[in-house]
A protein has these predicted regions:
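Conserved ABC ATPase "signature" region
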Residues: 87-88, 138-156, 185, 262-266
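Conserved ABC transporter NBD signature motif
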Residues: 80-88
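Short catalytic/signature loops enriched in Gly
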Residues: 4-13, 26-32, 37, 246-335
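P-loop NTP-binding/switch modules centered on Walker-like glycine-rich loops
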Residues: 187, 191, 195, 199-277
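A short, proline-enriched helix->beta-strand linker immediately N-terminal to the Walker B motif
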Residues: 180-184
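ABC ATPase NBD coupling module
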Residues: 30-35, 89-105, 131, 137-138, ...
Length: 335
């Protein structure tokens, strides 16, 4: 997968994740010895091109949020590399890492807990500017007010506290905070999952407008396929710490090549009650990442699995069609 092509659009690669691994130790006993490892993210690789949005989708617990946080080193990786403009972020320390982080920001999932309740939102938005030593106090205030205006808030809102805002407004504040440093790359970690449907579209459209204006690159993490389809250029599907499919938005939604992706697609509600779609019902529950299945991690729930092969050999991401990567031994059977 590390040889993933750059694509026909000619845009250069901004982010290149290679073999990313994040395992969490499980400790037990009086001496808190390590008894096992939760394989939250297990050898995933992908690229994100300059100016595009890559959607990262999967069920809760599949590792998508951990992948995003590890990329920014909010949690330290177990192994792998993350190249940003050709520089390995995982190899940076001290001032070099701090300088790199100015170009990489995150919008958190929960707009209620991601803001300090004791801090006026103007201070929250300008805090990153102060940490990175951007300008003087007057210049930082101008950038802060401009960032608030960009997300649809007014200058008088800067003195108010988070509890005085609605959920949608708080998420806009989170976006303004990420935008203030004028980064090149933003990870949006389920930014609309805690919002009403009527507010979700407003926030999504805001993200798209800001991307066009500031030439931003997004990693958009979500579990809602309809949301991912609305905003993404390409989509990666995760299952139990692995990427099982990666393709353009149009290709993935028209021709899903992995049985897990097909099951997710079949669960999307149709807007017309007179239309029906054949549901793909998966058997059993998602296995534990503490003890994942051998071979293909999806094989215990897969409707086309051949036990002797799928349980013994782990499939690798391979190019099923141009720019369409699938991790399945029998993906051709679904064509």
């Amino acid at each position: 997968m590390t040889g993933e092509p750059s694509g026909a659009n000619g845009h250069k690669t901004l982010v290149d994740v290679k073999g990313l691994v994040k395992h969490f130790p499980v400790r037990a006993g009086l001496l808190q010895r390590i008894r096992g490892w939760v394989q939250a993210v297990d050898h995933i690789s992908f690229t994100i091109r300059e100016g595009e949005t890559l959607g990262l989708v999967g069920e809760s617990g599949c590792g998508k949020t951990t992948a995003g946080r590890t990329m920014l080193r909010l949690v330290e990786p177990t192994s792998g590399s993350m190249l940003f403009e050709g520089v390995d972020v995982f190899a940076l320390r001290g001032r070099e890492l701090k300088a790199m982080r100015r170009n990489m920001q995150i919008v958190f999932q929960d707009p209620f807990s991601s803001l300090d309740p004791r801090m006026p939102i103007g201070e929250s938005v300008s805090e990153g500017l102060e940490i990175h030593g951007v300008g003087n106090a007057k210049q930082r205030r101008e950038v802060m007010l401009d960032s608030l205006r960009r997300v649809g808030l007014e200058s008088y809102h800067a003195k108010r506290y988070p509890h005085e805002f609605s959920g949608g407004q708080r998420q806009r504040i989170g976006i303004a905070r990420a935008l203030a440093l004028r980064p090149k790359f933003i990870i949006a970690d389920e930014p609309v999952s805690a919002l009403d449907v009527s507010i979700q579209s407003q926030v999504l459209n805001l993200l798209k407008d800001l991307q066009e204006e500031f030439h931003l690159t997004y990693l958009f993490i979500a579990h809602n396929l309809a949301v991912v389809e609305h905003i993404s250029d390409r989509v990666a599907v995760m299952y139990l710490g692995k990427i099982v499919e990666l393709a353009s938005r149009e290709e993935l939604f028209l021709n899903p090549g992995h049985p897990y992706t097909q099951a997710l697609m079949s669960a999307i509600p149709l807007p017309d009650p007179n239309l029906t779609r054949q549901r793909v019902i998966l058997q059993g529950d998602v296995p534990s990442p503490l003890n994942p299945p051998s071979g293909c991690r999806f094989h215990p729930r897969c409707p086309i699995a051949r036990l002797e092969h799928c349980s013994a050999e782990e499939p690798q991401l391979r190019e099923l069609r141009p720019e369409h990567w699938v991790s399945c031994h029998y993906a051709e059977d679904l064509l």
